[in-house]
A protein has these predicted regions:
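Conserved N-terminal entry element of GNAT/NAT acetyltransferase domains
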Residues: 1-27
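A conserved beta-strand-loop-helix scaffold within acyl/acetyltransferase catalytic domains
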Residues: 23-101, 133, 233-244, 250-256, ...
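Conserved acetyl-CoA-binding loop-helix of GNAT-fold acetyltransferases
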Residues: 99, 105-120, 127-130, 257-266
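Conserved GNAT acetyl-CoA-binding A-motif
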Residues: 120-133, 271-281
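Conserved catalytic-core motifs of GNAT/GCN5-like acyltransferases
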Residues: 131, 144-170, 300-311
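C-terminal "cap" of GNAT-fold acetyltransferases
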Residues: 158-194, 310-335
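Short, cationic low-complexity segments
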Residues: 193-225, 329-360
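Non-catalytic interaction/regulatory modules that flank or connect domains
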Residues: 201-304
Length: 360
């Protein structure tokens, strides 16, 4: 059992801060909400977190484990959550680490992350998962020190006109997230059906995670037929109308894949700020065929979501009309090389979409 703990911290001026790191207790709700409001005002994308009753019920139902950093005078200096996704996914996400501004600069983030990871490791999860922001790299660096490794990006998730925070956005109009992973119970990714062009990237990610994996020898695309495909794809989707973000998950590719994708694009046209991210099961032997279809429709490779469920996923994105300024992202040195590769994939995709270059 992981016990609550006290940590003593100093800022650069020599001021000390004694904080108790612990699990949520009833009565913490208003203090946690105050942390959110101090940074985001009323614009935090997890709107339910402004509701004290939601925090109580999610904690009671064990869907979300809320954690608190409490000062000597009983004020909540910071909050964080551990969120599980059973039965769809077997990982646990460490997320929503938010501090009141007056308690920043003491180095509280690292011990708080480490405390959360200890709680997480005490359970049987396939992986620890985090989506750090890209408007600063503090979280990325601290998670790396804690053992999480870079795997890619989920682009254009949140409309920056609808979120207020205390960091610079640069020229981007939508906020993107990085993907960081630590392997826990899942130690074998199985056989991966990935395009040859992305296998070097994927190999680096899986090797950094220290798990077993293998690449299936890719057939020539012309050899991939539909005769051995199932009739119907297994796909799910959700669209966040507030953030103009469509998320598609493809568990199985069938003959109807392109038709169903086109129908989704008709339902949620990629105009104005509407964008789409797609998670493609790359343990499916038809993933390469699906990738070729997606590439022709304006999607490009942005990384991997590994070890989070029974299946492995590559991540793709269609920015629609949204311009992406990768140079304005704030990323750690570990993410920098991955970002350069994703930027290359984006520029190649844009050339294809606008007829400025050759396919591939």
């Amino acid at each position: 059992m992981v016990k609550e703990r006290k940590v003593k911290l100093k800022n650069k001026n020599g001021d000390t801060l004694l904080v108790l790191l612990r699990e949520y207790r009833k009565g913490d709700e208003e203090g946690m909400i105050a942390c959110i409001r101090d940074e985001y005002g009323e614009t935090y994308f997890k709107r339910d977190f402004y509701d004290p009753e939601y925090i109580k019920s999610e904690s009671d139902n064990h869907h979300i484990k809320f954690l608190a950093a409490q000062t000597e005078d009983k004020e909540i200096a910071g909050m964080m959550i551990l969120k599980q996704f059973y039965p769809e996914e077997s990982m646990c996400e460490i997320a929503s680490q938010i501090f009141r501004k007056k308690y920043r600069g003491y180095g509280l983030a690292l011990p708080f992350f480490q405390y959360g990871l200890e709680l997480l490791k005490a359970r049987n999860y396939s992986a620890a998962y985090c989506l750090p922001v890209t408007f600063h790299h503090i979280t990325q660096v601290l998670l790396y020190r804690s053992g999480l490794r870079a795997a890619g990006f989920i682009l254009n998730v949140f409309d920056l006109d609808k979120i207020i925070h205390s960091y610079e956005n640069g020229r981007n109009t939508k906020h993107s997230q990085a993907i960081q992973i630590m392997a826990l119970d899942k130690r074998d990714a199985g056989t991966l059906y990935l395009p040859v062009e992305h296998q070097k990237f994927a190999g680096m990610v899986y090797e950094s995670l220290g798990v077993n994996f293998s690449f299936h020898k890719e057939k020539m695309i012309s050899e991939w037929g539909e005769s051995d495909m199932p009739d119907y794809s297994d796909m799910t989707f959700s669209n966040d109308a507030v953030q103009s973000n469509l998320e598609i998950r493809v568990l199985l590719v069938g003959r109807d894949f392109k038709k169903r994708l086109l129908n989704l694009h008709r339902q949620f046209p990629l105009c104005r700020k509407q964008t789409a991210s797609l998670f493609l099961n790359c343990n499916d032997c038809h993933a390469v065929k699906a990738y070729e279809i997606l590439k022709k429709m304006g999607y490009f490779f942005t990384g991997l979501k590994p070890l989070c469920s029974e299946k492995e996923y590559m991540v793709l994105h269609n920015p629609g009309k949204v311009q992406i300024y990768f140079d304005d992202y704030m990323v750690s040195s570990e993410f920098a090389s991955l970002l350069l590769y994703v930027k290359y994939c984006y520029e190649r995709s844009q050339n294809m979409v606008f007829g400025l270059g050759k396919d591939g």
